[in-house]
């Protein structure tokens, strides 16, 4: 179990995370759609996740979404590193009705994000461009490489939810147990 607290002038965040959980979550960021996505992330990755954020959402959702990504990435890093006895690489495609998004992951200590989802538009009052900000913060603080590739879809909610679910399933697969030690020819990650 990892617990991280982070407080800035813009947000106050607490994250509790157990990667070998059962998918339970307790999420409260003040941003309803974002809470829904984090619940999906926990459920489909199998991790237990608590996220509480008191952010300046009266200004914009940006600080809340970005900072939750930072803290969640740090918590995942603390849970996983040093890397050993995991698969390391994984991918998944989750569909939601007409939408499909593929996520490819490398839990390899080298942060990189390829992001190919639509960035324009709103889901109620949630700006689509915030999805990229969240994943960018998460990926760089977790120190993983992720390719998040839009395959098809027209409903923005479905597209984003497909991305979160695909990320969750790929993460669960990448973190699955492997007996052979450190999954790298370098001998270290």
From Swiss-Prot:
Associated pathway: Amino-acid biosynthesis; L-histidine biosynthesis; L-histidine from 5-phospho-alpha-D-ribose 1-diphosphate: step 6/9
Cited Pfam families: IGPD (PF00475)
Catalytic activity: D-erythro-1-(imidazol-4-yl)glycerol 3-phosphate = 3-(imidazol-4-yl)-2-oxopropyl phosphate + H2O
Molecular functions (GO terms): imidazoleglycerol-phosphate dehydratase activity
Top EC group: lyase
One example of a Gene Ontology biological process annotation: L-histidine biosynthetic process
Any single Gene Ontology cellular-component annotation: cytoplasm
Chief subcellular location: cytoplasm
Subcellular location, record wording: Cytoplasm
Protein name per the record: Imidazoleglycerol-phosphate dehydratase
GN (gene name): hisB
């Amino acid at each position: 179990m990892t617990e991280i607290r982070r407080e800035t002038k813009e947000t106050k965040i607490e994250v509790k995370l157990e990667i070998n959980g059962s998918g339970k979550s307790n999420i409260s960021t003040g941003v309803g759609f974002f809470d829904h996505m984090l619940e999906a992330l926990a459920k489909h990755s199998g991790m237990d996740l608590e996220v509480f954020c008191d952010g300046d959402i009266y200004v914009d959702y940006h600080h809340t979404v970005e900072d939750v990504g930072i803290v969640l990435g740090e918590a995942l890093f603390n849970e996983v590193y040093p890397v050993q006895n995991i698969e390391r690489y994984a991918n998944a495609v989750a569909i939601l009705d007409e939408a499909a998004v593929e996520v490819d992951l490398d839990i390899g200590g080298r942060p990189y994000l390829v992001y190919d989802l639509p960035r324009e538009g709103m889901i109620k009052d949630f700006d689509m461009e915030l999805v990229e900000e969240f994943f960018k913060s998460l990926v760089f603080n977790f120190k993983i490489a992720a390719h998040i590739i839009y395959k098809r879809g027209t409903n923005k909610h479905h597209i984003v939810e497909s991305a979160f679910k695909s990320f969750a399933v790929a993460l669960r697969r990448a973190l699955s147990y492997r007996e052979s030690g450190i999954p790298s020819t370098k001998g270290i990650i």
